[in-house]
């Protein structure tokens, strides 16, 4: 009995110790400044720091439609409500850098005068300077994932931070680390795909890129991050944005929480909350998750912010509150620190009433305000609320453009290359067709100059569309543009004009090869919902008719999610998935098609083949039921068009000599895994080396395989390099039925390409803490 009691006591002590080790180390100087400021504030001023309004409320448009700051209106709002934060571009459209500099200087001057506390501005800089004209647009996050290159992620975030701080904005609502595990969901392209490890690594790299190494001292070239959308947002049961998700408790902890935990451990200063519900509980009302998992278990002292007006959803849609005041009570007590209430200050009055009525404790208001003030001190906003654009000479320059091109090039995935149709030789006549052949909007996607990205062609005119890039490389006289199908730019993202397929077919008679650029127009969030995952019938008919000409067809997929193309895939000799590569996407594609560059991207998600087979790569063996005999003769095979991690190259690679440092292991061990990779082709290339594991027998149904490590290597023809990974034995653990992390005794298999090794765990270990 004494031994049992001792074990229980030690488990409790271990849990307490773990919970009290904060993911961000406290800075005594900053904490003293925060407390000194906090004690000077009235209740109204504290609540004001918890509020975030949209920029539009602080100004108006002149007769030419150009936004300006109305200093009288700004003074009135800040004097009365003591607002602590402002978001979004005016008119939801990118101003120039000079305009941003002026807007924020005007507001900060009034804020410091009226409150003595600077506002903190936030923007959705989701793939570069998305809300500043003249800034750099990088590939979308799904492309970053396809590179399997952490340095691309980090350097892109560093450049984004530089250009964002250049216009005096110190905060971005990025990176998005939801797991895109439902192909129907309209925001897959905003995050890093379906795998929690890949998402964790890329998200962590971006946090370091945005913020730097020290979250307590963020310099003038870095900005605060907001990891989003916490959590379970990416797997709505309907596939539609902001609708409920149903996730097993084990998957919620093991997979969906993982990227957020990695970001917190990297020092992320803020987190944005999932707009919808998970397992019947709206996330904005879930105290167990928001306060328990996110704050108390990790010791995290950052800011938890709502998404757009989401507290209102608690009474208008989720029906867990009777009115707005009740919704505020629920959300703030659940752990919300900042309220994104874009167009209304009503919450200020309600919060004051709730505190005076004892329905929200003053300690909760102090905690929320303290967190906001802490972020502002960490950003050094009290001393430097604004920056000077002239001090940022690299803004919108060649250095960042080259980085955007590099990222786009490494992200594109070669899916098919029959008969070595690619690279396309010079001197050939090429037909460029399809709705994505001559639009910057399609290359940039949503969150590009505007929310839906619908004005990208207006702002990105100096960059090359796919057609323009082909003309530059192959000569305009050798490239014919006849799109056959076009988008209705005045309609919904999915609307197309009356097809002119015969015109494209006629044009194909005079060419050697057809390049069909198909996919989706730009969209984001709820406007991007769909009812059918198949690529549009018009576009598929275009490909079918062109294939009848007998000319070879290369498909270029330019889409935010994997639209089904099973009926036209066999008709193409070459297929390239460029995802959403940004302003340099046209040039990157042509560099690859011409052979000047080599493909190295790999699929960051599973590309489905059938509408009823949307499984992820880590599906469990029990999800795939083979044919049975007799009365129960049926087949439940999981089909895929292309698997996670799939991608071809102009060269070939041979893997050999897989070694592990130990065949037996236990909790706490580090297993060294090495493999030789040789470039056996005739051109140089980069190869992403992926290490997977399989738990062969477990007390809960195990995943078929899981990604555990990856790295990218560059090899010259004939060159061999040894890749070495240090695999933590604890990474082979899983979350069990009781919600506890558990590493079980038993057999495992490690796999890299066609190489494998068997290893054995000698002892079972269960963690006493919520997180490993």
Residue ranges and their predicted role:
Residues 757-772:
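Short beta-strand elements
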Residues 1-23:
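Bacterial Sec-dependent N-terminal signal peptides
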